[in-house]
């Protein structure tokens, strides 16, 4: 990992969304130098599912040598941002670094993204970044080490990611486009850059999106913190860059990236905003004996499932059912399959003993999954992770996401038989 140099001692770092996850990790890294940290986040009271508040983060920051100023800030509220900036100036005398980390996410396609969710992503990601930047810039311009760092992806017009997550992509790209504009607008005064991970990062949000077991495919938040720390030490002339965490750390001389892995040696889930991963990551994944299902369609030369593969899969699923499985799951799944051997199938894990069949279930489905027959067979045979299928757009899910995650556990039990 990247060692601390002490160069941020006395600097004031204003971080949105710093009560947990990536934001807190960046805060702790800077705090080890003796930096002042403004924790600008919403969570003042403990959340039932997400650990950490602005006050617990402040305790951790001060425990490693930093000074903390916890501020209740919803980045959608301009007055709350302004109030936090004023408190920071009053307590620390200035602001040297702004990290726009707060973000809202919904991995849904256009028709499945409610307007309320669209507004949330636009207001937190795009508008919130603008408001925080605007409030801090007058003070950043007075700093000798002024930086704005947006946690946002490089601009990539490949439609692969836009296709299934258009609203989220636009909201994040808004953050990235501020880098283009502000880097030029404040050239020579403030360095403005973006930082994004090469692979999935393990956070509470990733657990909610990916479900149990996703952490083994992720890196720790420490890699983003180290990459951000590297950027903070660069001169103002380093501006307008879209930095990938692994790349900048290689420039710092880091060679062993297993130290950042949750499960060293396990294949990592690549980030889909990037085009660079297919060949390099495929080779690494294949070397472990796994199947690199994240490849682009044009790179996939997988054979079609044999005739009747779907029916055979459901037969094996049915043989695997039991009262214990039904009791543990309590859900009805509907599969809308396209392609060869396509059609509508159901998996009833509510009725005694469970049941499968072709057509509609007798009761309303709790979860509807849409995919090709090829991908259905691969999922149930363990060659395609449901999380990867969902995030790459191969799998569409409607209904109860918690019950969808339960099905993944059942799939894991059946893999050996399929």
From Swiss-Prot:
Tissue expression summary: Ubiquitous.
Record-linked Pfam families: adh_short, SCP2
CDD domains per UniProt: HSDL2_SDR_c
GO cellular component: membrane; mitochondrion; peroxisome
Residue span, SCP2 domain: 306-415
EC number: 1.-.-.-
Gene Ontology terms, MF aspect: oxidoreductase activity
Chain sites annotated for binding NADP(+): 17-23, 42, 74, 172
Record PTM N6-(2-hydroxyisobutyryl)lysine, positions in chain: 42
Localization per Swiss-Prot or TrEMBL: Peroxisome; Mitochondrion
Membrane spanning stretches: none
Residues annotated as the enzyme's active site: 168 (proton acceptor)
Key words of the record: Acetylation, Hydroxylation, Mitochondrion, NADP, Oxidoreductase, Peroxisome
Domain of life: Eukaryota
NCBIfam families: PRK08278.1 (NF006133)
Family as reported in the entry's similarity comment: Belongs to the short-chain dehydrogenases/reductases (SDR) family.
Chain's role: Has apparently no steroid dehydrogenase activity. Controls bile acid (BA) and lipid metabolism in response to nutritional cues.
Protein name per Swiss-Prot or TrEMBL: Hydroxysteroid dehydrogenase-like protein 2
Gene name, Swiss-Prot/TrEMBL: HSDL2
């Amino acid at each position: 990992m990247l060692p601390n140099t002490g160069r941020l001692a006395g600097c004031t770092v204003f971080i949105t969304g710093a009560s947990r996850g990536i934001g807190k990790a960046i805060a702790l890294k800077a705090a080890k130098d003796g930096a002042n940290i403004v924790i600008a986040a919403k969570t003042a009271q403990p959340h039932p599912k997400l650990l950490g508040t602005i006050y617990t983060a402040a305790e951790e920051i001060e425990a490693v040598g930093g000074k903390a100023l916890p501020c209740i800030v919803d980045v959608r509220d301009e007055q709350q941002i302004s109030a936090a900036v004023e408190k920071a100036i009053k307590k620390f005398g200035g602001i040297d670094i702004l990290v726009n980390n707060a973000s809202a996410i919904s991995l849904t396609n256009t028709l499945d993204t409610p307007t309320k969710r669209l507004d949330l992503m636009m207001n937190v990601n795009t508008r919130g970044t603008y408001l925080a930047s605007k409030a801090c810039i007058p003070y950043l311009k007075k700093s000798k080490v002024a930086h704005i760092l947006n946690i946002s992806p490089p601009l990539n017009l490949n439609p692969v990611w836009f296709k299934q997550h258009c609203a989220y992509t636009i909201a994040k790209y808004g953050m990235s486009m501020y880098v283009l504009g502000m880097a030029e607008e404040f050239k020579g005064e403030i360095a403005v850059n973006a930082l994004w991970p090469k692979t999935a990062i393990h956070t509470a949000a990733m657990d909610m999106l990916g479900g149990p077991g996703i952490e083994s495919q992720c890196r720790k938040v420490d890699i983003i913190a180290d990459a951000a720390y590297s950027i903070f030490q660069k001169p103002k002339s380093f501006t307008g860059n879209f930095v990938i965490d692994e790349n900048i750390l290689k420039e710092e001389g880091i060679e062993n990236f297993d130290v950042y892995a949750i499960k060293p040696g396990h294949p990592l889930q690549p980030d889909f905003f990037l085009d660079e991963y297919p060949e390099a990551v495929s080779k690494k994944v294949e070397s472990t004996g796994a199947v690199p299902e994240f490849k682009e369609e044009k790179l996939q030369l997988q054979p079609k499932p044999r005739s009747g593969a779907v029916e055979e899969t459901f037969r094996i699923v049915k043989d695997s059912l039991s009262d214990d499985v039904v009791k543990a799951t309590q859900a009805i799944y509907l599969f809308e399959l396209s392609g060869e051997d396509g059609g509508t199938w159901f998996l009833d894990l509510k009725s005694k003993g469970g049941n499968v069949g072709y057509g509609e279930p007798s009761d309303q489905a709790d979860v509807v999954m849409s995919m090709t027959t090829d991908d259905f067979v691969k999922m149930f045979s363990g060659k395609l992770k449901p999380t990867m299928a969902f995030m790459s757009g191969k799998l569409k899910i409607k209904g109860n996401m918690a019950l969808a995650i339960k099905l993944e556990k059942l799939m894991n039990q059946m893999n050996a038989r399929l």
